[in-house]
């Protein structure tokens, strides 16, 4: 099939969005990012509990698939950026089958220790969207409107996840083992400066 899409996936903080943007720039393709959709939902809808946050994540996934299906209907190539996991396989496979699309999967992985360090730095970075970091309430009510809430040292800092839990989550959910058949390229992003996009 000449119709194809590129799936950029892999472990948390492996650099999926940077990679997706680089490939998009080079191939002049649109990128649909589940995290970006999630951020739009965080800002426009918000959440007041962990459950509501999870529901926005599910909604973001549905919107991502909807957009992908529209591009497939038009026979256009595109990039999907998402932390695909074992449980996403059937939904993605069904789309590929329905529209007779081939997928090239770029799986970003590397030394878990180094990537875990990057994960911790990202979670406490002022540039990280707060909706990803907090679990109870976003926008954060008490400090709304002040610069205070962007303070990475505030008490709403990410509940620290241990290295063991980080690795266990990757293995249990299959972040670096996801596959829908087709061509798959594993990219080691332990050291970003060594990657030749």
Predicted regions and their residues:
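Conserved nucleotide-binding/hydrolysis micro-motifs of P-loop NTPases
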Residues: 36-38, 109-114, 191-193
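Hydrophobic anchor at the beta1->P-loop junction of P-loop NTPases
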Residues: 8
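Conserved phosphate-donor/acceptor-positioning beta-strand/loop module used by diverse small-molecule
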Residues: 99-121, 187
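Small-molecule kinase domains that catalyze NTP-dependent phosphoryl transfer to phosphate-bearing small molecules
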Residues: 125-195
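Conserved substrate/cofactor phosphate-moiety recognition/catalytic segment
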Residues: 17-73
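Walker A (P-loop) ATP-phosphate-binding motif of ABC ATPase nucleotide-binding domains
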Residues: 5
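Glycine-rich phosphate-binding loop used to anchor ATP phosphates in small-molecule kinases
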Residues: 56-103
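The conserved Walker
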Residues: 12
């Amino acid at each position: 099939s000449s119709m194809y899409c590129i799936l950029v996936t892999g472990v948390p903080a492996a650099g999926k969005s940077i990679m997706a943007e680089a490939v998009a720039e080079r191939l002049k393709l649109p990128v649909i990012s589940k995290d970006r959709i999630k951020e739009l939902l965080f800002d426009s809808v918000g959440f007041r509990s962990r459950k509501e946050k999870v529901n926005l994540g599910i909604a973001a996934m549905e919107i991502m698939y909807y957009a992908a299906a529209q591009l497939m209907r038009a026979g256009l190539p595109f990039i999907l950026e998402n932390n695909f996991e074992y449980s996403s396989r059937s939904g993605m496979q069904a789309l590929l089958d329905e529209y007779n699309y081939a997928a090239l999967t770029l799986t970003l992985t590397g030394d878990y220790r180094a990537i875990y360090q990057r994960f911790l730095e990202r979670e406490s970075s002022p540039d990280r969207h707060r909706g990803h970091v907090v679990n109870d309430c976003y926008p954060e009510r008490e400090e709304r409107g002040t610069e205070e809430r962007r303070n990475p040292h505030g008490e709403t800092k990410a509940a620290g996840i241990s290295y063991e839990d980080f690795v266990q989550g990757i293995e249990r959910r299959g972040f670096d083992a996801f596959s829908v058949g087709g061509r798959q390229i594993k990219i080691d992003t332990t050291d970003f400066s060594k990657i030749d996009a």
